[in-house]
Amino acid sequence: MGVKIGELIEDKVELELSDIAGKKIALDAFNAMYQFLAKVRQPDGTPLMTSKGEITSVHSGIFYRTANFLKEGIIPIYVFDGEKPSFKSRAIEERVRAREEAELKWKEALEIGDLEEARKYAQAALNITGDIVEDCKTILKLMGVPIVQAPSEGEAQAAHMAMKGDVWATASQDYDSLLFGAPRLIRNLTITGKRKLPGKEVYVDINPELIELESVLKRNGISREQLIMIGILVGTDYNLGGVKGIGVKRALELVKKYKRPEDLFSKVPWEFDVDPISIYEFFLNPPTTDDYDTSLKRPMSDELLKFMVEEHEFSEERVKKVINEIEESYRMLSGGGLESWF
């Protein structure tokens, strides 16, 4: 879901993948996996599956998209969520409810043969299971791509790594990374290409875009702390929907009038079970770890081929071709080329 602060962000720089060649990018793994689950589908919205009915849309996205990053000279570091904060339970419940409703509408659309509607609802109907997560970690490890296990929110950990300078930017479709302090956020990194507009036979080009935290703060005349307060007012994953009657523009006015969170939240009708100061403090000081390695490793090609082809029924010819490209990318990136870029 993420925080809805897009109205505050005007300075977006469109990127080509070549613009970030040589950079290490920390990706919100779950955000990327849900993008792949939504995008890699058959015409009726059904995800890719093995003959046993095991979903492989996410496997496909992780494998082929990550290989393309490496080919472009980009080192992706996938950051996986850890334990959710206790006050995120409502957001999780809401997602489960929305998935159940979408699944019902998907099946209804299939029954009447409305493939357009079926595909739309299918994108929201499926979940990332624990088995899919473990499979994706295995694929990345066999590719030699770094993975990081966050103690809590993946975006918080990615932002921490960016603030330390261990990665150049974070990557996610959500803006939460900015509230967690990421100096740079790249959106659309995992969905670059053409995307169909909802309900229309129209396709638009989607390119990565760079957002810099300092530019956002300077343009709006606020601090990061005030940005966090705006996020809480309009709604985060921890207080869905935000404070009634307050949109982004009104929130901006309020944080400029009441600069301390204690003053601000005492002036608005707060109707959530969670204390707003707890959310504020979580964004400022989330649990993170320094126990990670961002270096690219040599791919385990034989094991990767077996895992993709024998266990998950991918095309042997195509997988072999991509593995050869991964091996070449590793030689390029580990042979001194990366240091000259990063």
Curated annotation (Swiss-Prot):
Query: Taxonomic lineage of this organism?
Result: Archaea, Thermoproteota, Candidatus Korarchaeia, Candidatus Korarchaeales, Candidatus Korarchaeaceae
Q: Which Gene3D superfamilies match?
A: 5' to 3' exonuclease, C-terminal subdomain (1.10.150.20), 5'-nuclease (3.40.50.1010)
The protein's name in its UniProt record: Flap endonuclease 1
Looking up HAMAP family in the UniProt record yields: Fen
Tell me the domain of life: Archaea
Record-linked SMART domains:
HhH2, XPGI, XPGN
Give residues annotated as binding Mg(2+) 2: 174, 176, 237
Tell me the GO molecular function terms. 5'-3' exonuclease activity; 5'-flap endonuclease activity; DNA binding; magnesium ion binding
The UniProt record lists the EC number as 3.1.-.-
- Enumerate the PROSITE patterns for this protein: XPG_1
Q: Does the keyword Lipid biosynthesis apply?
A: no
Species of origin: Korarchaeum cryptofilum (strain OPF8)
Name the segments for region: I-domain: 117-259
Q: What binding details are noted for the cofactor? A: Binds 2 magnesium ions per subunit. They probably participate in the reaction catalyzed by the enzyme. May bind an additional third magnesium ion after substrate binding.
